[in-house]
Amino acid sequence: IIQGDRNKSEDIDKIDFDAYGCIVDMCLFFEAQYDLFVDRMNESTNYIFVSSGAARGDYMEHYGDYGKDKKRIEERLKESKLNYKIVRPSYIVGKGNHRPRLGHYMNKIIHREHIEIAGDGKNVVNVVFVEDVVNQLVRLATTQARTYEMIEVVGDNIEVIDLIYKVFKYVLDDAYQGNVMLVQDDEKAILPKNDFTFETNWDYTKLEEGLKDYAKWYYNEGAKKYGYII
């Protein structure tokens, strides 16, 4: 794991880029960060840029500078001589994910707390399980050829309200008593109110299968990892 402040040239200078046959870049957000390392990279190094579904043209307007910056980096890579590959995940969910979207819903439902949603909650979003993202990263990392591949790593499309209802099914019966209210709060909602859908023909983890597996993990270790109380 390469660690340091990628915004500082002196930290970038400490990296022996020639020592790496493959680099998976998960924290490149700004074009200025790209400029700091691109000339230091070996052109034959298998470089995988983790972009975002927000970089797709029909969704960029909903994600402000984040989507635009990711898109610009994609364009810079295409102009470069690097051996690049690009991954665009949708909303990542699942075991160990650093943003516990499903865990957030599980915790709220278990404690019978209200859940904030954006808009009426009927917008359709796409969720992909972290295992699927990892599998695609491994595949690309072991493909040294210059494929210049760009892949949208996605899963099932579902209305936000339906996603919450499906999570509800996997909360154990010994949860707290009471009702769970859905409250419109665009700022606190963990999923925005715009549609965010994708289509794919690759073999991904289906939502029901992934939720069932996630719930077991959540009760065994996930809640503790995220600091939630069951």
Task: Specify the residue positions occupied by each region the protein language model found.
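Alpha-helical substrate-binding/gating segment
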Residues: M106-E116, N123-I158, L172
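Residue-level signal for the nucleotide or nucleotide-sugar donor/cofactor binding architecture
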Residues: K68, V128, I158, W202-K206
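Conserved Rossmann-fold NAD(P)-dependent oxidoreductase catalytic core, especially the SDR/UDP-sugar
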Residues: Y34-S80, Y84-R88
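Mid/C-terminal beta-alpha module of Rossmann-like enzyme folds, strongest
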Residues: R139-K193, K212, K224-I230
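NAD(P)H-binding glycine-rich loop region in Rossmannoid oxidoreductase-like domains
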Residues: I1-S44, A54-M60
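Hydrophobic/aromatic beta-strand patches that form the interior of the parallel beta-sheet core
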Residues: I2, V24, N46-I48, K85-V87, ...
